[in-house]
């Protein structure tokens, strides 16, 4: 998993509450277990018309936001089913950080496991960031996980809280496998000692 220390990029505004995982990645895209290629299906029902043509009015289709790295979204983001394809689709599109006032628990934890930083802020701060994100290509925001600060286009900063263990994993690029490998020396030492003390096992 790629490390997350500091991210600077365009923030896209999505002021919609209760965006569920079905909206993030529709069921038609769930037939694969690959993590790549799902970016085309991200918000597909909003990004494309029924005939498959691009909906130019959807925020991520607008030229200023096509390479957005940060999503500023409404309350209760990621609710609904627990499909892990949702963070996969966000990541494959290029989104590495989602900022909202709240997240569904399963989606929130899945983000950390896949290298996406979900940040919870107050309603007041979300409104400030949403205003910043309306600036199009000038909506450049920096998210610093080391200092736990979000810096807007005008230089103003917002602090955010995050679980220390999750922060450690993101800063060091550790998913579940990486966490296990981090303890590989201790595991090897235990196995050696265990084999010596219990040769019959």
Swiss-Prot record:
For molecular function, the Gene Ontology terms on record are: 3-isopropylmalate dehydratase activity
| Swiss-Prot/TrEMBL keywords | Amino-acid biosynthesis, Branched-chain amino acid biosynthesis, Leucine biosynthesis, Lyase
Q: List the disulfide bonds.
A: none
The pathway is: Amino-acid biosynthesis; L-leucine biosynthesis; L-leucine from 3-methyl-2-oxobutanoate: step 2/4
GO BP terms in the entry: L-leucine biosynthetic process
Catalytic reaction(s) noted: (2R,3S)-3-isopropylmalate = (2S)-2-isopropylmalate
This entry's Enzyme Commission designation comes to 4.2.1.33
Specify one Pfam family. Answer: Aconitase_C
UniProt lists the family membership as follows:
Belongs to the LeuD family. LeuD type 1 subfamily.
Q: PANTHER family, per this entry?
A: 3-ISOPROPYLMALATE DEHYDRATASE SMALL SUBUNIT, 3-ISOPROPYLMALATE DEHYDRATASE SMALL SUBUNIT 2-RELATED-RELATED
Q: What is this protein called?
A: 3-isopropylmalate dehydratase small subunit
Organism encoding this protein = Allorhizobium ampelinum (strain ATCC BAA-846 / DSM 112012 / S4) (Agrobacterium vitis (strain S4))
């Amino acid at each position: 998993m790629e490390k997350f220390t500091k991210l600077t990029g365009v923030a896209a505004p999505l002021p919609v509450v209760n965006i569920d995982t079905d909206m993030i990645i529709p069921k038609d895209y769930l037939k694969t277990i690959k993590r790549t290629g799902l970016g085309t299906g991200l918000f597909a029902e909003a990004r494309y018309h029924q005939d498959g043509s691009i909906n130019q009015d959807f925020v991520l289709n607008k030229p200023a936001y096509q390479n957005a790295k940060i999503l500023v979204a409404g309350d209760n983001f990621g609710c609904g089913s627990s499909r892990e394809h949702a963070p996969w689709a966000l990541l494959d599109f290029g989104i590495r950080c989602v900022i909202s006032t709240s997240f569904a628990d399963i989606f929130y934890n899945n983000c950390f496991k896949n290298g996406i930083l979900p940040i919870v802020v107050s309603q007041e701060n979300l409104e400030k960031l949403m205003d910043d994100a309306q600036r199009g290509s000038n909506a450049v925001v920096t998210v610093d996980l080391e200092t736990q600060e979000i810096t807007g286009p005008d230089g103003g900063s917002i602090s955010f809280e995050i679980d220390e263990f999750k922060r450690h994993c993101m800063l060091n690029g550790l998913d579940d496998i990486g966490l296990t490998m981090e303890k590989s020396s201790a595991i090897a030492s235990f196995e050696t000692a265990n084999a010596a003390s219990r040769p019959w096992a």
